[in-house]
Each structure stands twice: as structure tokens, then as C-alpha cells.
Amino acid sequence: MSRIGNKEIQVPDSVNVQIQDKNFIVVTGPQGKLEYQFNHKIKILLINTIIKVSRPNNELFMKKIHGTTRALLSNMIEGVEKGFVKRLEIVGLDYKVDLQGDNLILHLGFSHSIKITIPKGIDIEIPKKIKGIHIKGIDKQFVGEFASKIAKLRKPEPYKGKGIRFEGQYVIRKAGKSTKK
């Protein structure tokens, strides 16, 4: 039994959900518009402002996709209503981040700077008080993938903790070399 799949989704007044043929769903809201094609075997019903997701049988595949479908729908509704933000922290003395048009320029201690093109649907904000990057968008998966792509450029090293990490991420530290006595 999927506990997540059986929960109902409450649709806010500011969000419009359209269920078209073969479970093609369009969700529009104040932040933007998202579209997704769900598995056609899953039943998705919109009753007034409540969405119910149900499966036709108890096969293993249907059990797996039931909760996933409900979670994706919930994320779509939350994304077009409020949006999602991933925050990255940059730890290191000479590490810098610049925003030039549609490009993100990262200076991460390499002999060259790294230039990343910002995709459509992603907004980037560089706060002034802390060294970091705020990645915003309406698609939770897309925002997370882009943030992960940036974080992989310079993973935090265990001795000084220098690198790019997600906000609140704990880095396991190691002791340095000890001298002989």
C-alpha cells in the first residue's frame, strides 16, 4: 500500500490544473506553467480542488509508480505556486562567482575560470553578504540537477572544507599530518 500515493492533493485557488487525454497534465500558476505526461494506466481524478491518484491493480510496477505520480503532481503544483530554491555555499578564500548575462562564471582555484550557461527556467541570484549561489525555478527536478551540476565542479575536500556545498551539508573533516616527536 502506497501511503504517499493515497494522500489527496489540495489545489490552491491561484493554480489551474488541466487533465487532458492519456494523463497529459498542464499546471499553470503565478510562477509559470508546467506540463508532464504521466503513465496512462494510473487514474488521476480532479474533483473541485482535490486531486486523487489511484492505481488499477496491485502489480509491483503499479505500486511503484503510484506514489511517484502523486509526488510529481504535488511538486508541480507547489512549483508553479511558490517555486523552488536550492542554495549553494562556496567555501574558499579565492573562490568567486560572477553573473554575466546568461552565463555563470566560477573562479574555483583552477588555472582557468569555468563558464556555465544558465538554462531557461532557472534564475540565479548571488547574495552579497555570503559567498554562495541561489538557484530558483518552478521545476524541482531541473533546479536540483542544475545545482548538483554546479556543486560537482569543486566538491568539498576533507582537510579544510574548501569547495562548493549545499546549504546545511555536513562535510566530514580529517586531521592533517601529525609530526613525529
From Swiss-Prot:
Keywords in alphabetical order: Ribonucleoprotein, Ribosomal protein, RNA-binding, rRNA-binding
TM regions (residue ranges): none
UniProt key word Zinc-finger: no
Recorded GO MF terms: rRNA binding; structural constituent of ribosome
PROSITE patterns in alphabetical order: RIBOSOMAL_L6_1 (PS00525)
Coiled-coil residue windows: none
One record GO biological process: cytoplasmic translation
InterPro entries associated with the record: Ribosomal_uL6-like, Ribosomal_uL6-like_a/b-dom_sf, Ribosomal_uL6_a/b-dom, Ribosomal_uL6_bac-type, Ribosomal_uL6_CS
Protein role: This protein binds to the 23S rRNA, and is important in its secondary structure. It is located near the subunit interface in the base of the L7/L12 stalk, and near the tRNA binding site of the peptidyltransferase center.
Similarity annotation: Belongs to the universal ribosomal protein uL6 family.
NCBIfam families: L6_bact (TIGR03654)
HAMAP family the record matches: Ribosomal_uL6_B
Name of the protein in question: Large ribosomal subunit protein uL6
Provenance organism: Phytoplasma mali (strain AT)
Protein encoded by which gene: rplF
